[in-house]
Amino acid sequence: MGIIGAGHVGSTVAFILATQGICQEIIIKDLNLDTARGIALDMGHAASATKTHTIVRVANEPSDLRGCDVVVFCAGSPRQPGMSRDDLLLANAKVIRTVLSEVKPYIQESVLVMVSNPLDAMVYTAIKESGLSPLQVLGMAGILDSARMASFIFEKLGYGSDQIVASVMGGHGDDMVPLPRYSNVAGVPITELLEPQEIEEIIHRTRNAGAEIVGYLKKGSAYFAPAKSTAIMVEAILKNSHQVFPCSVLLQGEYGYSDVVGGVPVKLGSRGVCEIIELELLHEERERFDQSIQSVKSLIDALYHHAFFVSSRP
């Protein structure tokens, strides 16, 4: 598998995959070759220490990514304090265009996992720029947001950390849609375990978790949880597990939307998206989901407004 961008998230994804022996070979591509070489060498030592025998090497040329089953795209500018994901829109869209123009001839058989923010708009951009089927391009967000929600549920309850299932849909931003009704502890809905005010606090912290971390770090943003969430996706794809995870994908009629990306439950396999699962949403849940998708649509519209894409919007 390949990793584009050897910053905090990309290198941590590589570390997790290498030390768990999830893949045979990891190829790291970064603008700074020396940085990539140093990380690859260090990572290879870590793999050896854990007896996984995963090979970690550097992509000296774009063609070195040929044959990768999965390519994780982490390149781009991170969020800084006071910066929203939306501020990153044009800058990171240009990064995606530049990098994919170099590597796309060699990744046509790969599944492309996007991590760069603003996530949903970057997934859309990658679909447009890569030439891949929309089923081969998906974004890592829902697993991360659900993990954050599960962590906050555990903070409130104080038990059942390994039995908590949290569900978050919609865009990866301030309008994401945590779903308490689909969140449970060993099958018991959290609506039966927590007071409404406690659930609202969990929803608020889930939506603002990324910004909260940025505020504490001052420089940079979260990377441990995003990297682990990405590694979970990669493992499911490589193992053709058909496990269901919330992922950001292009909607083509699902939930009544087309030509827009949103986070929804997806069955993952070796070719990417096997199936998009449509949940039944109550009226209030549906309204929040619609609002979230409209926020993503406004970002995509902004890219068209700035004439980023050659073609007009379908």
UniProtKB/Swiss-Prot annotation:
| GO-annotated biological processes | lactate metabolic process; tricarboxylic acid cycle
- Which residues bind NAD(+) per the record? 5-10, 30, 92, 115-117
Q: What keywords appear on the UniProt entry?
A: NAD, Oxidoreductase, Tricarboxylic acid cycle
Residues annotated as binding substrate: 79, 85, 117, 148
* Residues forming the catalytic site: 172 (proton acceptor)
Q: Which reaction does it catalyse?
A: (S)-malate + NAD(+) = oxaloacetate + NADH + H(+)
Q: Which GO terms describe its molecular function?
A: L-lactate dehydrogenase activity; L-malate dehydrogenase (NAD+) activity
Keyword Secreted attributed = no
**One of this protein's Pfam families, by short name?**
Ldh_1_C
Q: What is its EC number?
A: 1.1.1.37
Which PANTHER family does the protein's record reference? L-2-HYDROXYCARBOXYLATE DEHYDROGENASE (NAD(P)(+)) (PTHR43128), L-LACTATE DEHYDROGENASE (PTHR43128:SF16)
Q: Which family does it belong to?
A: Belongs to the LDH/MDH superfamily. MDH type 3 family.
Q: What does this protein do?
A: Catalyzes the reversible oxidation of malate to oxaloacetate.
What is the designated name of this protein?
Answer: Malate dehydrogenase
